[in-house]
Regions:
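Bacterial N-terminal signal peptides
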Residues: 11-22
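A gly/proline- and charged-residue-enriched helix-loop-helix capping module
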Residues: 123-139
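Low-complexity, intrinsically disordered/propeptide-like segments
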Residues: 6-8, 17, 96
Length: 373
C-alpha cells in the first residue's frame, strides 16, 4: 500500500514516454479555430502537481492552436466544483479539472467510486478507467449532464491529514474540526469522532489561521501550500485515508460547437496533459517525502504510517463510507458501490506494489521544474 519511496523508483519509464500522444503536425496544420477557454480547478497553484499540469496545458495550447488562450483558475477562484459542474452543464464554463467526489452534490452517483480501502495500490489507481463503474459514470455524465469526460488523472498517493499536531490514531481526531474534501470523507472523519468541515481549498489557509478548523484532509501537494500552519502531515498510501480521483471534463454544449479539427487537437493535448500530471503527481509525492519525511511521528513533517497503523484507522471506519454512499444514492444505483468494491479488489490483486509504470518514473527529469519549498 505504501509508496515504495525507498526503492529504485526512478528507473527510466520508456513505456510511459511512448504512451504520451503528441499533437500531430498534420492535424495542427489544418484550419483550426482559436479557443479562449476557462479552466476551473479546486486545488492550490504550483507546486501542486495538477496545477503544474494545467500550467503545461496553458503553455502548450497556443502552440498547437495558434491564437488560443487558457485561463486557469485555482483553488475555487472562479467556481467551487459543484458550481463548475453546473456551469459546464449549462454551457457557461468550458473546462474543469475536478475531484470526482466533490461533484456529488450535483451528481450523487459520483460517490460510488469514492472512499477508503478500495483501490490501494498505485497500479490499481492507474487502472480506474478500466472499471465498468467508471465507464458507466462517464456515459451517464454525457447523457444526463451534457459533460464530456476526457479521462481520469491521479490524486496524490500520499493523501492524508495535516495539522498543528499529529493525526495518527483514531483518538487523535476526537473532538477536532477537520477540513473534509467531500461528503464521503465526512463519514470517515465522523467514525474517528472528528467534526468534518467541508470547504474549498482556497478557504483553508485562513480557516487554519483563525481556528475554524484544527486540521485538514488533503494531498501532499495541498499540504505544501499550508505546511507552515500545519507542519504535521500523516499519510498511509493509496486508499488509506480516502480514495478519490480527478477527472478532466468539458461542457458538451461548448465542445460540440468546436470544429472537428479543433476538437481532435484539443483531445490529444488533454491526454498529453493527463499523462504529464501522472508523472508530476508521483514525483511531487516522492520529492516531498525525500525533503520532509520523518520516521518519528512526534516530529513535524510527512510521516508514512505502518500497515498496522493504517489498519487501526481503517478498522475504526469499517463500512461507514459505503453505508453513507448507499444512503445518498437512489435505490437503483446502490449496486454501483458493491460493483466498484469488487472491481477494486481485483485491480489490487492484479497490480501489486511496485508493478506499475508510475513507480518507475525517472523523477530526475523534473528536478528543474519541481521545487519543493
Amino acid at each position: 500500500m505504501a509508496l515504495n519511496l525507498d526503492r529504485g523508483v526512478c528507473a527510466a519509464a520508456f513505456a510511459c514516454a511512448a504512451a504520451v500522444t503528441a499533437v500531430s503536425p498534420a492535424v495542427a496544420q489544418e484550419k483550426l479555430k482559436p479557443v479562449v477557454l476557462r479552466f476551473a480547478a479546486d486545488f492550490s497553484p504550483p507546486p501542486h502537481p495538477a496545477a503544474m499540469a494545467l500550467q503545461y496545458f496553458a503553455e502548450r495550447l497556443p502552440q498547437v492552436i495558434p491564437g488560443s488562450q487558457a485561463r486557469i483558475y485555482y483553488a475555487g477562484a472562479l467556481y467551487t466544483i459543484p458550481e463548475a459542474f453546473e456551469a459546464m452543464r449549462q454551457g457557461n464554463l468550458e473546462m474543469s479539472w475536478m475531484q470526482m467526489g466533490k461533484a456529488a452534490p450535483v451528481e450523487p452517483r459520483m460517490m460510488a467510486v469514492v472512499g477508503p480501502g478500495v483501490l490501494t495500490t498505485v497500479g490499481a489507481v492507474d487502472s480506474l478507467e478500466k472499471t465498468k463503474t467508471y465507464q458507466e459514470l462517464v456515459a451517464r455524465l454525457a447523457t444526463n449532464q451534457h459533460i464530456k469526460v476526457f479521462g481520469a488523472a491521479h490524486m496524490s498517493f500520499g493523501m492524508g491529514v495535516g495539522g498543528s499536531k499529529r493525526y495518527l490514531k483514531p483518538e487523535d481526531f476526537t473532538g477536532r474540526k477537520v477540513r473534509s474534501m467531500g461528503p464521503v470523507e465526512n463519514a470517515s472523519l465522523s467514525s474517528w469522532k472528528a467534526s468534518p468541515v467541508v470547504m474549498a481549498f482556497g478557504e483553508v489557509p485562513s480557516a487554519l489561521q483563525s481556528g475554524v478548523i484544527d486540521g485538514l484532509m488533503t494531498s501532499i501537494g495541498g499540504w505544501l501550500a499550508v505546511r507552515e500552519q500545519a507542519p504535521y502531515y500523516t499519510t498511509g498510501g493509496a486508499g488509506a485515508f480516502t480514495g478519490d480521483y480527478y477527472m478532466v471534463a468539458a461542457s458538451e454544449r461548448w465542445w460540440n460547437r468546436l470544429p472537428k479539427p479543433t476538437q481532435a487537437v484539443l483531445e490529444k493535448l488533454v491526454q498529453e496533459t493527463i499523462q504529464k500530471e501522472k508523472e508530476l503527481n508521483w514525483c511531487v509525492d516522492k520529492m516531498t517525502y525525500e525533503k520532509y519525511g520523518t520516521k518519528d511521528p512526534s516530529k513535524p513533517g510527512v510521516y508514512w504510517m505502518t500497515p498496522q497503523e493504517v489498519q487501526q484507522l481503517v478498522a475504526a471506519v469499517g463500512d461507514a463510507s459505503q453505508r453513507y454512499v448507499k444512503s445518498k444514492l437512489p435505490p437503483d444505483a446502490t449496486g454501483l458501490v458493491d460493483q466498484f468494491a469488487k472491481e477494486g479488489r481485483a485491480l489490487d490483486k492484479a497490480n501489486p506494489p511496485g508493478s506499475s509504470w508510475v513507480e518507475k518514473i525517472d523523477c530526475s527529469k523534473y528536478a528543474g521544474q519541481i521545487v519543493i519549498k
